[in-house]
């Protein structure tokens, strides 16, 4: 066990045994919708000891993960110490990038699907960043925490309610962070709207609209590698909202979800599934594997969420039809509304005109309401890139919090609640749109948790 001392091994073995026992007794409770017994104390607002240097292990450096190689190589106080990917081509690309930055050589792992466990067994890794196909998110994040690491996992955090509970329980048992890296929460517009909401610009919040509308049929041509090689199959297996968090995450933060309010229940319906089959017929030979799949996922899925405080959120998913990109990013309050794509605002009091017409000139709004974090880091974020800078800013903020002993902006409860839309929408669609309840992953702590602050 290179780099993994006996004491650490024994401690990890004890935690793993406890986790196994907990899972055995909690499984039936999760399956029936009953809130399982807590595995440990809540990790709401978890603060861990300050780290002078954050040692980063990366699992998955393909289409998404290569960006993390660049970001963490540029952030002061972060050092990539280990990288794992089963694809030696993308691993070589990551190694080339590390060398170009003049950084110390990390350890590399690539032999087999479980080579990541060699990375987890190292004592020079503090956090594990997981950017792999969705099916690996849950097991890798869980094993990372059981190995004593903080887990940072790409979206969605997991694919079933039981898996989501398992990550919550493991985080509480190990007292480790498990953050789903919802990068859109760090976009300039989303941060500005959060600042507007916190300053009461829209009055009492009533309704939000979120979406992931992004035409991705072209990914079906990625057969042996890249995202489409594994993501296409989901459209033939599930009918619901496969990818809810990019739009929902920011709206949930506006509404203080898990910090004063909670997602209560959901109802979901889907349109017919036509676009994927038509695209396959047009673009591939009749005997091609893409024409052998039966695509059941509706081209457009629409889910309606009710919160415990009575507010409503519409969440849509469409990666099939030909239309412009949108996440909606709409928030409606008693004093007015903001909507994205394109950005526009209408207010009864405090606006520049009639609330019956949109104000689409955002310059004055940016000048007054740009989030302090963007004011401080926006230029550097844009220069370093990643979806307009949001990716870099997210990574910078993660490292900043760990180095300064601050709680992360997103926790395991956020990742669980936002990701739960996927399995709950599938269940609702399959049940004629009947409502499905969200678990209270916080076990009641949402009622006393402090809202996410405005940090600079």
Curated annotation (Swiss-Prot):
Origin: domain of life: Bacteria
UniProt GO MF annotations: hydrolase activity, acting on glycosyl bonds; nucleotide binding
Function: Glycosidase.
Cofactor note: Binds 1 NAD(+) per subunit. The NAD(+) cannot dissociate.
Cofactor names: NAD(+)
Enzyme Commission designation: 3.2.1.-
PTM characteristics: Predicted to be exported by the Tat system. The position of the signal peptide cleavage has not been experimentally proven.
Keywords: Glycosidase, Hydrolase, NAD, Signal
One Pfam family named in its UniProt record: GFO_IDH_MocA
Name of the protein in its database record: Glycosyl hydrolase family 109 protein 2
Signal peptide: 1-33
InterPro entries, sorted: Gfo/Idh/MocA-like_OxRdtase_N (IPR000683), Gfo/Idh/MocA_oxidrdct_glycsds (IPR050463), Glyco_hydro_109_C (IPR049303), NAD(P)-bd_dom_sf (IPR036291), TAT_signal (IPR006311), TAT_signal_bac_arc (IPR019546)
Binding site for substrate: 212, 231, 243-246, 325
Positions with a binding annotation for NAD(+): 63-64, 85, 134-137, 154-155, 183, 243
SUPFAM superfamilies for the chain: NAD(P)-binding Rossmann-fold domains (SSF51735)
Native source species: Shewanella sp. (strain ANA-3)
Entry similarity comment: Belongs to the Gfo/Idh/MocA family. Glycosyl hydrolase 109 subfamily.
């Amino acid at each position: 066990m290179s780099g993994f001392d006996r004491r650490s091994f024994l401690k990890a073995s004890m935690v793993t045994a406890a986790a196994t026992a907990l899972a055995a007794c909690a499984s039936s409770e999760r399956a029936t919708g009953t809130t399982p017994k807590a595995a440990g104390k809540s990790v709401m607002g978890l603060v861990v000891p300050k780290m002078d240097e954050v040692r980063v292990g990366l699992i998955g450096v393909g289409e998404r993960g290569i960006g993390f190689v660049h970001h963490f190589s540029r952030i002061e106080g972060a050092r990539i110490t280990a990288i794992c990917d089963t694809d030696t081509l993308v691993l070589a690309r990551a190694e080339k990038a590390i060398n170009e930055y003049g950084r110390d050589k990390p350890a590399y792992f690539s032999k087999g699907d479980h080579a990541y466990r060699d990375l987890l067994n190292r004592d020079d890794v503090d956090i594990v960043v997981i950017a792999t196909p969705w099916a690996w998110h849950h097991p890798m994040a869980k094993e990372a925490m059981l190995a004593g690491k903080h887990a940072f996992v790409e979206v969605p955090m997991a694919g079933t309610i039981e898996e989501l509970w398992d990550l919550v329980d493991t985080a509480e048992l190990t007292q480790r962070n498990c953050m789903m890296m919802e990068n859109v929460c760090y976009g300039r517009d989303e941060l500005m709207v959060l600042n507007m909401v916190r300053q009461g610009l829209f009055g009492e919040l009533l309704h939000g609209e979120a979406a992931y509308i992004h035409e991705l049929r072209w990914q079906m041509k990625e057969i042996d590698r890249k995202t489409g090689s594994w993501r296409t199959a989901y459209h033939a297996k599930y009918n619901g909202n496969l990818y809810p968090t990019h739009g929902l995450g920011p709206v949930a933060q506006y509404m203080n979800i898990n910090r004063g309010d909670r997602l209560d229940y959901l109802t979901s319906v889907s349109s017919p599934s036509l676009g994927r089959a038509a695209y396959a017929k047009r673009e591939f030979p009749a005997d091609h594997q893409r024409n052998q799949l039966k695509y059941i996922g509706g081209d457009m899925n629409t889910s309606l969420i009710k919160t415990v405080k009575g507010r409503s959120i519409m969440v849509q998913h469409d990666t099939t039809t030909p239309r412009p990109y949108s996440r909606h990013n709409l928030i409606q309050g008693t004093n007015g509304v903001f909507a994205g794509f394109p950005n526009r605002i209408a207010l009864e009091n405090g606006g520049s005109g009639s609330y019956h017409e949109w104000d689409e000139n955002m310059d004055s709004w940016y000048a007054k309401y740009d989030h302090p974090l963007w004011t401080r880091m926006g230029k550097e974020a844009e220069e370093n890139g990643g979806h307009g800078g949001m990716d870099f800013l997210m990574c910078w903020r993660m490292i900043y919090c760990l180095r300064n002993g601050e709680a992360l902006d997103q926790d395991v409860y956020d990742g669980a609640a936002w990701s739960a839309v996927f399995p709950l929408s599938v269940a609702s669609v399959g049940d004629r749109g009947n409502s499905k309840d969200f678990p209270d992953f916080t076990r009641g702590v949402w009622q006393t948790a402090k809202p996410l602050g405005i940090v600079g």
